[in-house]
Amino acid sequence: MAPSHWRLILNGKSTDNEDLREAVGVLRKRGIQLDVRVTWEEGDAERYVAEAIADGVQTVVAAGGDGTLSEVAAALAHHQDDAATLPSLGLVPLGTANDFATAAMIPLEPLGALGLIAERAAEPIDLLRIDADHGPHWCANVASGGFGTQVTVETDAGLKKMLGGLAYLITGMSRLGRIDPISAHFTGPDFSWEGEFIALGLGNGRQAGGGQALCPEALIDDGLLDVTIVPALNGEVAATLGTLVTGGKQAALERVAVRTRLPWLEIASVQPLTLNLDGEPETSRHFRVECVAARLRMHLPIDCPLRSA
């Protein structure tokens, strides 16, 4: 039997990771043909995935943070082939927050993550397809809006590198006096909500922005989109809630959040609204977010909380 052929796509910011280098060496000694490609500029992941498909690679591994995972997943989803034909997807978490990996219980150490890919068969997973003013996008984890999105967008890259997820909380605290509600109309099958909100989570996965568990019950294989809307409140209550949301405190969300589970959701706003798509901001006045069932296959732990079975 021919050896497994993998293509690891590494975020260029993590090229100095010695643990990853050693882990790649271990997998190669086990007989896996493991090639490494490093992203340098926009479009590299798309090109590397296309090359992997043309080369008959069996598994594409995203090595980086949530943005790298989403970029590689999107590059796979852009191809017309179905999930059974496309290479499977693996993840080595090397980002600041690693929200998807944390929620999915994927090992945070490179050797453990690569070992999981070798040991566990790939399973179907959903992806979010987002249509906006500037064309379609794909999202593997969570699309978020409002207070949490501004925190993620504004968090300094140097601060993230030094402090990890704590950087998001510090940035959130600095915004306490300027939580601006956003007005929007949300519609989906048998669902309609209109008003001002301060936080929004659209979950394929469960958490984003350094531990904000906006969609704590989301599943990655149920064909449904988990929606969490945190309505606007007034004065000090809003500021306090904003801090709790940033810190991932579920009690605050449970008391005030509007929650539903839908195959798709449309969002309309008079003012431009920014959604954070796994770290990439997209601004539009209209969004359609659809959960595309079983779009890819991914290697996940047997006890992964995001799986329905």
UniProtKB/Swiss-Prot annotation:
ATP binds at T39, G65, D66, G67, T68, L69, S70, E71, T96. GO terms for molecular function: ATP binding; lipid kinase activity; magnesium ion binding. Its EC number is 2.7.1.-. It holds the Pfam family DAGK_cat. One of its GO terms (biological process) is phospholipid biosynthetic process. Mg(2+) binds at L219, D222, L224. It is an enzyme of class 2 (transferase). The active site is at E280. The keyword Iron-sulfur does not apply. Its main location: cytoplasm. NCBIfam families: lip_kinase_YegS, PRK13054.1, YegS/Rv2252/BmrU family lipid kinase. HAMAP family: YegS. Belongs to the diacylglycerol/lipid kinase family. YegS lipid kinase subfamily. This is Probable lipid kinase YegS-like.
